[in-house]
């Protein structure tokens, strides 16, 4: 099933952009709702991978039904969640982006809002946004060998209401770390610190660091983008590296 090749070139090596344009112009076979499950496929996550998987599912299996389940209220995944100053990609978008919709932005190393807009535009252009159930998270996924089906237990984030859906094929596009519980190391004496401690993964939108003395702990990709961006208003910024 070619869905897993979401970021790979076509198997015959040909440029797929012309065929993509043609496929948008001609009528596609209409999806046929399966009789024994709710959907043929369910994709968990509406970030860059989830939208890519949906595109290839539509392209190679246009008669199959599918649903994208997204816990947040917006498309984008990481690029909707992270709001810290200087947020940008670590890889160039010509490589990181979709081969069926090449990146045309001015900067190859793009900022977070531009990447989010690119993913949203892709979802709209191919009608993928019409297949997303926002504000629902997957609590459990149970496989039955007897019926060859997945049963997913969902929870509506707004009020905790639970429901179940079934499918034949399940694709996890949730990323590789916990969005709700970022890793935070233990620091002795942390409770005695009288300043503000912020994890970049949950950056407050209204936080004003103007005139503040800032210490950034760590020197990874997040710190490398965060430190230069904060020097415009902060009084002093120091990076600590172990």
What are these regions (language model features)?
Residues 72, 101, 138, 144, ...:
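Short, solvent-exposed coil/turn elements at secondary-structure transition points
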Residues 105-178:
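Feature captures the FAD/FMN-dependent oxidoreductase FAD-binding
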Residues 31-38, 42-43, 48, 52-55, ...:
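Rossmann-like dinucleotide-binding core of oxidoreductases
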Residues 99, 153, 199:
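Residues in well-ordered beta-strands of folded domains
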Residues 1-29, 161-196:
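Glycine/serine-rich phosphate-binding loop and adjoining beta1-alpha1 elements at the start
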Residues 76-121, 242:
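Glycine-rich active-site loop/strand segments that organize a redox cofactor
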